């Protein structure tokens, strides 16, 4: 298992992932990642055995499900195909929850590093059970871990980024980038709730806008011969159809065929879905479509067709890093590209107008951990 993986079913269809840890681990090459119980991202050590690790600042984990109003007039009718698709996903996530309750007895997340402004002390002890102890901001740790404080951003090893809109920087990327074994996209799907959020990320305005934007992404020119494409999408049937329609879908336009339909199921700290599974208004999961070039002879394990990634959600718009989930199907030292990225990954490229968002030092702290070997 990877460092961020807390549980994986024997058939591989269910993976319990710690979301912040998946992003922390992606700041290093896979070979440098430690086990879940060990400190992550060790950047410096002191003579008394104290190690400093770079930790991602997270939001408090949800302890109870969200309350969301259902439509007063009931749900809008869905096409038959969309109804079947939703029922299949619902069955998958229900099965994933049952798998966890039956075969897993550990925690559903690792200790989180909360923002200093949210750490409420009570008699000198933090009251949030999920806060990582012994933390400081990068400025106050600068004399201990100077390598983490140079410049405004933290850059993972061998990471590359192209900052700008797709339209403005497409030529630059095509001229400078290699072909990629895996391409991950997190498009800015039109989303009213994202528009309402203060400081929310940029989203497309209309369905026509997002289609034009995706059509402008040169996937055929960027993808290696046997490469994979993973694309996040909302639960809106029109967007799923926009991607997968055999007649005029974006995947078909890119010369790709669908090989996997994964789901990211968001749960509370006690493994309850953050929203009712049968909610007509909002779903507790997000689809992740996996595709490859048409005619590819690659053979996938059975669990790749339908897989459920389970995790406790974090800050809005922050998704699990899936590098270590797709790596087993890729050649060693594969090259990856994340499009519409908001953070960087070691050894990968990132492309978009907000690629450095979560790489800012303000999103990270240095946390102290004592060496068990010395007891200091």
Swiss-Prot record:
GO terms for molecular function: methyltransferase activity; nucleic acid binding. Keywords: Autophagy, Methyltransferase, RNA-binding, S-adenosyl-L-methionine, Sporulation, Transferase, Virulence. One of its GO terms (cellular component) is nucleus. InterPro entries: DNA_methylase_N6_adenine_CS, MT-A70-like, SAM-dependent_MTases_sf. SUPFAM superfamilies: S-adenosyl-L-methionine-dependent methyltransferases (SSF53335). One of its GO terms (biological process) is methylation. It catalyses: an adenosine in mRNA + S-adenosyl-L-methionine = an N(6)-methyladenosine in mRNA + S-adenosyl-L-homocysteine + H(+). Residues 53-78 are annotated as: Disordered. Belongs to the MT-A70-like family. This is N6-methyladenosine RNA methyltransferase MTA1. It comes from Pyricularia oryzae (strain 70-15 / ATCC MYA-4617 / FGSC 8958). The lineage of its organism: Eukaryota, Fungi, Dikarya, Ascomycota, Pezizomycotina. The gene is MTA1.
């Amino acid at each position: 298992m990877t460092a961020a993986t807390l549980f994986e079913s024997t058939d591989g269809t269910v993976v319990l992932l710690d979301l912040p840890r998946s992003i922390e681990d992606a700041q290093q090459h896979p070979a440098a990642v430690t086990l879940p119980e060990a400190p992550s991202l060790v950047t410096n050590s002191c003579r008394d055995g104290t190690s400093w690790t770079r930790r991602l600042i997270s939001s408090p984990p949800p302890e109870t499900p969200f309350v969301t109003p259902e439509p007063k007039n009931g749900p809008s009718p869905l096409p038959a195909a969309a109804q079947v698709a939703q029922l299949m996903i619902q069955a998958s996530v229900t099965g994933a929850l049952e798998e966890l309750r039956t075969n897993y007895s550990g925690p559903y997340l690792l200790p989180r590093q909360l923002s200093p402004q949210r750490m409420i002390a009570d008699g000198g002890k933090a009251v949030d059970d999920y806060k990582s102890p012994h933390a400081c901001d990068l400025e106050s740790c600068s004399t201990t871990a100077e390598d983490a404080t140079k410049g405004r951003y933290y850059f993972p090893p061998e990471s590359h980024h192209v900052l700008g809109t797709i339209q403005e920087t497409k030529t630059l990327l095509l001229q400078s980038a290699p072909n990629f074994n895996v391409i991950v996209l997190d498009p800015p799907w039109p989303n009213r709730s994202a528009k309402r959020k203060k400081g929310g990320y940029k989203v497309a305005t209309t369905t026509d806008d997002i289609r034009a934007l995706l059509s402008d992404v040169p996937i055929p020119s960027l993808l290696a011969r046997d490469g994979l494409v993973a694309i996040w999408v909302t639960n809106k049937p029109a967007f799923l159809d926009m991607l997968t329609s055999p007649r005029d879908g974006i995947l078909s336009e890119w010369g790709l065929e669908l090989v996997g339909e994964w789901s990211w199921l968001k749960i509370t700290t006690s493994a309850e879905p953050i929203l009712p599974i049968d909610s007509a208004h909002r779903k507790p999961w997000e689809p992740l479509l996996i595709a490859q070039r048409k005619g590819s002879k690659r053979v996938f394990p059975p669990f790749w067709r339908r897989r459920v990634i389970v995790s406790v959600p974090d800050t809005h718009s922050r998704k699990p890093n899936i590098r270590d989930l797709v790596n087993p199907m890729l050649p060693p030292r594969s090259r990856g590209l994340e499009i519409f990225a908001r953070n960087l990954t070691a050894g990968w490229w990132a492309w978009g107008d907000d690629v450095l968002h979560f790489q800012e030092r303000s999103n990270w702290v240095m946390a102290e951990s004592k060496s068990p070997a010395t007891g200091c």
